[in-house]
């Protein structure tokens, strides 16, 4: 007798081994029809999976996140099937699920065209309507290699050859197409009804620029048409908000080929930078961080001690001088340990908090660069806390409060907190990991927040808390982290004198709230579609005169506002006032002041708020009060 335990606590008993699909049918015909996969004892499997012992089972449908992943993975295979039908000489390589969709890489003798994409999507629809069963077959590795070589799929054969010889591999077949895959997949192609091919791109085989350039086709797939339409609408909105376009349109910054992955900040953009940096500097000061500055370039010997030279050198910019090797720092932590080591420390000094606006450089592949979101040079609000194990929870609790206050000030209210736990490959004892993970859980419980745990996602040296912001389009951005590191202080010789007069190694907490300032500003630009709140706006007020008769008064008003700390643009051009208003409105300024004869004579100003909102005529002092209140409220 086999007992199958269901999520609602009920049980089903079967005399013989039973498939997931059969259990679903036993529960009800509706569930049997909706079933896409199953979760047996925590593992997602095909509906054809045979349950041979007492097990926990959840039936996966398109209402589950795992079900959407199965749909997308299966649609990637459907894409490859369609390409092989239309272009038999194309070779298939890999096709994983990604956020909101999937991609598949192909090798083909000519570039695919947008017209090809239309034809491929049409063929996918035809194949899906056939509702062909998707079947799984397991075979020995060498047999699988021989099979793919026999059908001319050299890339698949190469992938399988990298698998240990004693391992079996699984193949999935739908119609005439067979692919290597772990699975799981939908039971038949008819389950794939809502999908769209999005774009073409290039990708190196195995991500190595020394290898052949393949052709990557991106797609998206959903359970319901309405969900896909909402996603495509979000993409349209995201395109309008693209920080690269807005950065050029609003004269914030630019990029050019002579400096890939680096930013040329214009005066307006640099003003935004300064507002963010100054705000974060006050966060340091208000929370007892000592601001420091470590060198940009450090000797190879230090990077060897930290392990970066052996494990991260490909991502570092390296140089030589006078027969010594150096690297531009890709991160700030080793420099902070050196500052800590510059003096003898006592337990009375701990916790010791350092903060730096540290400029880092990482040699990211050119194909991975993306505006300000992925760069080669960036500055972090990077802090490190040296403390004892007993102080971890209190420090993390305090950091959490700081981070949440910062996100609220910048206009982010929807924050997901995630706890990344020990990975398979790690250093340290199980006991040290237990202590570190429980310290973070204890801190989060003390904060009264809910969180999601991510098993296996921690760094090799310690667990971390991640902060994921959702922007105005519902997109998630991982920005802040606080991470426990018991390793680096010891590798670099950091010590403190304990209560019992022995030497001990401190724990180091890596913490950042906004992370890369460049990336965070890019997120802000897209979140607000360039219409930054008053306190961040590079130009807060434009002062416009209607004619030369008001020029002197307009200058006096502008000067008055500047003296009170506002960022003001004075526009005395001899243009029609409607033209000037329209031009400054396009620049998304928070406020526009218009001055005519009436305002000049009465010593007032006519005020327009962003969005062409007419606030009427008011004295300058009243406007100043309004502006200061808005800035103080970070509204």
UniProtKB/Swiss-Prot annotation:
Subcellular location as annotated: Cytoplasm
**Protein's GO biological process:** threonyl-tRNA aminoacylation
Keyword Lyase found: no
Annotated positions binding Zn(2+): 333, 384, 510
Q: Which cofactor does it need?
A: Zn(2+)
EC code: 6.1.1.3
> Reaction catalysed?
tRNA(Thr) + L-threonine + ATP = L-threonyl-tRNA(Thr) + AMP + diphosphate + H(+)
Q: What's a single GO MF annotation on this record?
A: threonine-tRNA ligase activity
- Report keywords, A-Z: Aminoacyl-tRNA synthetase, ATP-binding, Cytoplasm, Ligase, Metal-binding, Nucleotide-binding, Protein biosynthesis, RNA-binding, tRNA-binding, Zinc
Region annotated Catalytic, chain positions: 242-533
Recorded hits in SUPFAM superfamilies, A to Z, give: Class II aaRS ABD-related (SSF52954), Class II aaRS and biotin synthetases (SSF55681), TGS-like (SSF81271), ThrRS/AlaRS common domain (SSF55186)
Superkingdom to which the source organism belongs: Bacteria
Q: Which GO terms describe its cellular component?
A: cytosol
How this chain assembles, per its entry, is: Homodimer.
Q: Which family does it belong to?
A: Belongs to the class-II aminoacyl-tRNA synthetase family.
Its biological purpose is as follows:
Catalyzes the attachment of threonine to tRNA(Thr) in a two-step reaction: L-threonine is first activated by ATP to form Thr-AMP and then transferred to the acceptor end of tRNA(Thr). Also edits incorrectly charged L-seryl-tRNA(Thr).
Name the HAMAP family on file. Thr_tRNA_synth
Protein name listed in UniProt = Threonine--tRNA ligase
Species annotation: Janthinobacterium sp. (strain Marseille)
The beginning of the lineage is: Bacteria, Pseudomonadati, Pseudomonadota, Betaproteobacteria, Burkholderiales
**Gene that encodes the chain:** thrS
């Amino acid at each position: 007798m086999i007992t199958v335990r269901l999520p609602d606590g009920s049980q089903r008993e079967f005399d013989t081994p039973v498939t997931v699909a059969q259990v679903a049918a036993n529960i009800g015909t509706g569930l049997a029809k909706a079933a896409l996969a199953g979760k047996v004892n925590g593992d997602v499997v095909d509906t054809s999976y045979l349950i041979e012992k007492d097990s926990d089972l959840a039936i996966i449908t398109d209402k589950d996140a795992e079900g959407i992943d199965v749909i997308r993975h299966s649609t990637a295979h459907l894409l490859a099937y369609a390409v092989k039908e239309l272009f038999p000489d194309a070779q298939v390589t890999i096709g994983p699920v990604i956020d909101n969709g999937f991609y598949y890489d192909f090798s083909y003798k000519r570039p695919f065209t947008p017209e090809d994409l239309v034809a491929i999507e049409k063929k996918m629809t035809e194949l899906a309507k056939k509702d062909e069963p998707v079947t799984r077959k397991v075979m020995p590795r060498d047999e699988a290699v021989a099979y793919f070589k026999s059908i001319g799929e050299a890339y698949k054969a190469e992938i399988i050859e990298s698998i240990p010889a004693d391992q079996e591999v699984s193949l999935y077949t739908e119609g005439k197409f067979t692919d290597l895959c772990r699975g799981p997949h939908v039971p038949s192609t008819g389950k794939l009804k809502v999908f769209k091919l999005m774009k073409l791109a290039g990708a190196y085989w195995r991500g190595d620029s020394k290898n052949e350039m393949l052709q990557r086709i991106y797609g998206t797939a959903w359970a319901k048409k309405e969900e896909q339409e909402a996603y495509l609408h979000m993409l349209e909105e995201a395109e309008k908000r693209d920080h690269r376009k807005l950065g050029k349109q609003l004269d914030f910054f630019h990029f050019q080929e002579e400096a890939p992955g680096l930013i040329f900040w214009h005066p307006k953009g640099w003003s935004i930078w300064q507002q963010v940096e100054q705000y974060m500097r006050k966060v340091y000061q208000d929370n007892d961080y000592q601001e420091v500055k470590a060198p940009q370039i450090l000797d190879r010997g230090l990077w060897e001690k930290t392990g970066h030279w052996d494990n991260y050198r490909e991502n570092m910019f390296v140089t030589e001088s006078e027969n010594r090797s150096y690297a531009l720092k890709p991160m700030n932590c080793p420099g902070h340990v050196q500052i800590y080591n510059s003096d003898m420390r006592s337990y009375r000094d701990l916790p010791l908090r350092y903060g730096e606006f540290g400029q880092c450089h990482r040699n990211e592949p050119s194909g991975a660069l993306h505006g300000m979101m992925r760069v080669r040079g960036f500055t972090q609000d990077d802090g490190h806390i040296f403390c004892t194990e007993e102080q971890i929870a209190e420090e993390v609790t305090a950091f959490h409060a700081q981070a949440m206050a910062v996100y609220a000030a910048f206009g982010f209210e929807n924050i997901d907190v995630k706890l990344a736990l020990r990975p398979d490959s790690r250093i340290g004892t199980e006991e040290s990991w237990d202590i570190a993970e429980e310290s973070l859980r204890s801190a989060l419980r003390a904060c009264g927040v809910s969180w999601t745990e991510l098993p296996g996602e921690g760094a090799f040296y310690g667990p971390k808390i991640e902060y994921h912001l959702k922007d105005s389009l519902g997109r998630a951005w991982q920005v802040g982290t606080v991470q426990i590191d018991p390793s680096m202080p010891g590798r670099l010789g950091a010590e403190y004198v304990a209560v019992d007069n022995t030497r001990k190694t401190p724990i180091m907490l890596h913490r950042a709230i906004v992370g890369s300032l460049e990336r965070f500003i890019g997120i802000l630009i897209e979140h607000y579609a360039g219409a930054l709140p008053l306190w961040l706006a590079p130009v807060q007020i434009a002062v416009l005169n209607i004619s030369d008769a008001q020029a002197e008064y307009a200058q006096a008003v502008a000067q008055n506002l500047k003296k009170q700390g506002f960022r003001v643009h004075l526009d005395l051009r001899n243009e029609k006032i409607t033209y000037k208003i329209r031009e400054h409105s396009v620049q998304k300024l928070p406020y526009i002041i218009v001055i005519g004869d009436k305002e000049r004579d009465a010593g007032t100003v006519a005020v327009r708020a962003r969005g062409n909102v007419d606030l009427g005529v008011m004295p300058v002092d009243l406007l100043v009060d309004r502006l200061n209140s808005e800035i103080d409220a970070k509204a």
